[in-house]
């Protein structure tokens, strides 16, 4: 695998107007990011919507939380809980970020508003920092 690089939104992606549901999802994502930024520790970096290029592919994790210590947390935000998120977080984002943050462990988390089966790990977004290295968790937050 080639070394991943950080970049801007690819020019070849369409600029179609988001659907009503997509707009709701974007607003919820911004709400989560704002909450994390306003309530978090100043020594913790929150990277929102960063594009990553590698192996002729491109991906964009919703949030990357980089605390001073402990694992870096890769976060996927959804309006409604999805069942296949862990695989995407580990196999797509995890592989690229493991190369960018060599020597740091990763953890993975899905934050969602609406529950559709399963049990939430927590109800508070900052509990993502309690995840152990390579652990996956889910947080329902409204």
Predicted features and spans:
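Domain-level recognition of nuclease-like catalytic cores that cleave nucleotide substrates
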Residues: 4-7, 19, 104-142
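Active-site metal-binding core of divalent-cation-utilizing nuclease and nuclease-like domains
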Residues: 38-69
């Amino acid at each position: 695998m080639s070394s991943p690089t950080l970049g801007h939104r690819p020019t070849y992606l369409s600029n179609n107007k988001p659907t009503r549901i997509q707009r709701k999802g974007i607003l919820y994502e911004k709400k989560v990011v704002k909450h994390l930024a306003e309530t978090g520790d100043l020594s913790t970096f929150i990277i929102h919507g960063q594009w990553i290029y590698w192996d002729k592919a491109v991906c964009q994790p919703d949030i990357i939380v980089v605390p001073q210590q402990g694992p870096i947390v890769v976060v996927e935000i959804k309006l409604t809980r999805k069942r296949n998120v862990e695989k995407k977080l580990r196999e797509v984002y995890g592989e690229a970020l493991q190369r960018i943050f060599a020597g740091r462990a990763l953890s993975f988390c899905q934050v969602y508003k609406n529950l559709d089966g399963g049990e939430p790990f927590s109800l508070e977004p900052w509990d993502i920092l309690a995840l152990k290295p390579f652990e996956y968790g889910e947080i329902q937050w409204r």
